[in-house]
Regions:
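Flexible, acidic glycine-rich loops studded with aromatic residues
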Residues: 401, 413-548
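Conserved, mostly hydrophobic/aromatic
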Residues: 85, 106, 161, 205, ...
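Hydrophobic faces of well-ordered beta-strands that scaffold small-molecule active sites
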Residues: 203-207, 234-236, 293-297, 352-354, ...
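Bacterial N-terminal signal peptides
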Residues: 11-23
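Feature activates predominantly on carbohydrate-active enzymes
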Residues: 142-323, 331-333, 341-351, 477-479
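Active-site neighborhood of glycoside hydrolase catalytic domains
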Residues: 306, 311-406, 411-425
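Bacterial N-terminal signal peptides that target proteins for export
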Residues: 1-13
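Acidic, contiguous N-terminal accessory segments
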Residues: 31, 36-195, 389-396, 403-405, ...
Length: 548
């Protein structure tokens, strides 16, 4: 029998062994059976959180990504119109946005419009508690994004930071969504205790918006979609060029627009740009879903937009001409630093990407040494502005390249395909070419998209010293002018199936059963068929993620 809410508050105080200290008026309220007290001490740790609760019968919920550790309880925890979202008062400011976001998502999933209570209050049956005070052995394991989830008479979501609490809310919402009830009326979850931490620090999707502009609304939808599956980085490749059918540069584009006249030449011929207001909107949505936006200005190669805006720094050895800027000219570094300096105040991410790939070195005036010197100097400029530097890897840059740079490995041929950048002293992210999508491109760049089953089965299972610190799947638009297609239809259709799988392999890796056998992705796909794009995305309602 479920104990009435009016009684649960007082019983929980007694059972917690001093969770709430009562005196004077509080003691009188307790004796009379009146409403909850106005003050409570810090929420006590439960037996499950301290590792002292016996395991029950409930199976591990098949949320995506799957949980690292699960101790099943018995029975279910239900929420109703009397439930509340309780925020530990000491964490009220830090968790205000997370609580509000969760409140809105929970209403979509369950139909419940629950109040947020940030004053001290004792949890009653069916309440949901958000706290930045982790318990027991899990406290040392959680890092910046991990969390614990205790589901008994009420739900307690704990983490060391707001990101971890957000991810705990996404897990709880997914558990609700998988309860078998009608859409918008999910009210029950299995009881149990989970501890969950990510495999990779960087869990990324990259969009080439330089060659093909993506609307703000499309990017906003993907930020929400990514947060649902615990992906935390949207890498935007903001400048590039695309060839016309005659082989010339039909488009050379940089997608950010400054109001200053000295940067007017960077506005592309198609006029499709992101203004400061556009960028601020995306950053706000990203923050709500704990996704960071990493901007990339790719130079000295892929820099046709910079060459068009400032012809004096163009490299003359290109075919076709006008796609590269000359790293040997002092004016080149000065100009690129000025562009970064103009837009750095827009960016909330501590990391910026400087490109650095595919330059026609060792011909004309450009050598490998001059390329590396340019990249090192640009990187030091950005570091002086308190930014971390990320770039595309190239083994020819060794050993001169600054070891503080984060490397994205992308080359999937020859000896470089297996290079371990950690052995060379670098933090690195796996961005292997096998996980590119190039619409209308060659077969080895997945022109028909990436299936979640393939990504799940074939992504590297390396651990320890051989493992990267992050993973990324990418959409490149090399053929933007050769075929007519849109982000909303073509690109989403090619990418959508891989997004939940990317969340799985970047956060958890492959799932294994009790016997240590790899769980087939088809089992996880059954959950994806229900979870879809998440409670915040309606844009792709006519393009569901397939059930098989």
């Amino acid at each position: 029998m479920r104990i009435p809410r009016s009684m649960t508050s007082w019983l929980s105080m007694l059972l917690a062994g001093g969770l709430v200290a009562l005196g004077g008026q509080g003691a009188a309220l307790a004796a009379s059976g009146a409403s909850r007290p106005a003050a409570a001490a810090q929420l006590a740790c439960s037996e499950a959180e301290l590792g002292q609760a016996p395991a029950g019968a409930n199976a591990k919920p098949m949320v995506i990504p799957t949980l690292r550790d699960w101790t099943g309880g018995n029975g279910t925890l239900s929420f109703d119109a009397g439930s509340r979202i309780l925020v530990d008062p000491t964490d009220a400011a830090a968790l205000a946005d997370t609580a509000t976001q969760f409140q809105a998502q929970l209403k979509t999933v369950s139909g419940l419009a629950l109040p947020i209570v940030s004053r001290a209050a004792t949890p009653a049956a069916g309440d949901i508690v958000l706290s930045l005070a982790p318990c027991g052995a899990s406290a040392a394991q959680l890092g910046e994004e991990g969390y614990s989830l205790d589901l008994e008479d009420h739900a307690v979501l704990r983490a060391k930071g707001a990101a971890g609490v957000f991810y705990a809310t996404q897990t709880l919402l997914q558990m609700l969504s998988l309860d078998g009830a009608a859409a918008g009326a999910h009210l029950r979850v299995a009881r149990g205790f989970a501890v969950d931490v990510p495999r990779y620090a960087e869990r990324s999707i990259m969009f080439d918006v330089g060659r093909k502009y993506a609307s703000v609304d499309f990017l906003a939808a993907y930020l929400r979609f990514m947060g649902w599956y615990k992906l935390n980085t949207l890498h935007l490749h903001l400048n590039d060029q695309a060839k016309a059918k005659d082989g010339s540069w039909g488009l050379r584009a940089f997608r950010l627009k400054s109001d200053k006249p000295e940067f007017a030449g960077l506005v592309p011929a198609d006029g499709l740009v992101y203004t400061r207001d556009d960028w601020d909107k995306l950053e706000t949505i990203a923050a709500a879903h704990h996704v960071r936006i990493v901007p990339e200005f790719d130079t000295p190669g892929h820099a046709g937009a910079f060459a068009a805006a400032n012809p004096a720094i163009a490299y003359v050895g290109d075919t076709p001409p006008g796609g590269t800027i000359d790293p040997t000219k002092p004016a080149t570094l000065q100009y690129v630093e000025s562009v970064f300096g103009e837009f750095l105040p827009w960016f909330r991410s501590s990391t910026v990407h400087i490109g650095g790939d595919e330059v026609n070195v060792n011909s004309g005036s450009i050598t490998t040494a001059s390329q590396v010197d340019y990249l090192n100097q640009l990187g030091r400029f950005l570091q002086s502005r308190h930014r971390r530097v990320e770039m595309w890897g190239d083994a020819s840059y060794l050993p001169r390249l600054d070891k503080s740079f984060i490397i994205q490995r992308w080359i999937n041929w020859g000896s470089e395909a297996s290079i371990n950048w950690a052995d060379k002293g670098y933090q690195w992210t796996e961005s292997y070419g096998d996980w590119y999508i190039v619409p209308f491109g060659p077969s080895y760049f997945n022109p028909d998209g990436i299936k979640g089953d393939t990504l799940y089965a074939k992504w590297s299972q390396a651990t320890g010293a051989n493992a990267p610190s992050g993973g990324q799947i990418a959409v490149w638009n090399d053929n933007a002018l050769l075929d007519s297609y849109t982000w909303e239809r073509k690109v989403n259709d090619l990418l959508k199936d891989a997004v939940p799988a990317a969340g799985q392999v970047f956060w958890r890796g492959q799932e294994h059963d009790a016997q240590g056998q790899t769980v087939d992705y088809g089992v996880l796909r059954r959950s994806v068929a229900t979870l879809q794009y998440g409670p915040d995305v309606t844009r792709f309602s006519d393009s569901p993620i397939p059930a098989r």
